[in-house]
């Protein structure tokens, strides 16, 4: 047989080259001998097996080559019918595998007729054809098995690729959902923080406004108290001036001109009347002053209490009205005192004018 080489890959990075060894049959009277040329192979790299079901001998082997390549062969030979199966034996020498198949009956070729020789040749030819057919069938099955393996491997790779793709898509979807949840949570936190900051700022502004209003009320009350104290001081100064002027008028003697000369004699009647008049006005002013003093003291105490309430934000609308009423009452009392003082001064001026004119007349 002619040797041929064929490269096949398994997809795992190793390539196989199919090797077809040369074989030769020899028919001897005692046995049938099969010689197979296996140059390059060692005894440990080959295997010979007898298949009882098909009465065939299978010879297989493989050896490594360079660059991750392997050389292999798988040959099948038919065992002749006139053969003792249990006595088949082989030997490997000089790269040649020799398989000896002893015959059941020893034939003498020298005494065989020509027809027997022809029949033996025909049988040998038929055996070789059968051997060739079986070899081709074995190779075809081997090729189909290899293709099935390749198909199975391809399907497995496609399945793994699909699983990987689905896993990557699921992972990407999960990461997208996680990012979305994180962004939503961050937006909620920022909104809550912004709302809290706005509430704090609004509260601070409200507190500042209330504090400013309280300061304005305190300043207003202080201004009112200062104004009332200034008015009271002014009225007291005016009263002291009026009283000092009246005392001078009372103590000044009236000059009376007579024929013997002028003599300064007091007028008890008019003086007593004037004194009584001054005494009535003084009592009115004194009474008003006492009432005003009591009112001022009460107002000061009340003002202090109200100031404390204003600081504590406890002042009521009724207390505000009471404060206004106290201020109005004080103004009325001040006005009444001023009016009484003015009236008294006017009456004193009018009464002093006739007396002076009468005292200035001289007797003839």
Curated annotation (Swiss-Prot):
Keyword Hydrolase: no
Domain sHSP, first and last residues per copy: 14-121
Compositional bias (Low complexity): 346-364
Cellular compartment(s): Cell membrane
Keyword match Transcription regulation: no
Biological process annotations from GO: defense response
CDD domains (alphabetical): ACD_sHsps-like
InterPro entries in UniProt: A-crystallin/Hsp20_dom, HSP20-like_chaperone
Residues in B- repeats: 163-176, 178-191, 193-205
Region 6 X 5 AA repeats A of L-E-E-[SKR]-[ERK]: start-end pairs: 129-220
Topology with respect to the bilayer: Single-pass membrane protein
GO cellular component: plasma membrane
Ranges for region 3 X 14 AA repeats B of [IMA]-[RK]-K-L-Q-E-E-A-K-A-K-E-[EK]-[LA]: 163-206
Transmembrane stretches, start-end: 322-342
Role according to the record: Seems to not be involved in heat resistance. Unable to mediate restriction of long-distance movement of the pathogenic tobacco etch virus (TEV) without causing a hypersensitive response or inducing systemic acquired resistance.
Protein name (record): Inactive protein RESTRICTED TEV MOVEMENT 2
Encoding gene (name): RTM2
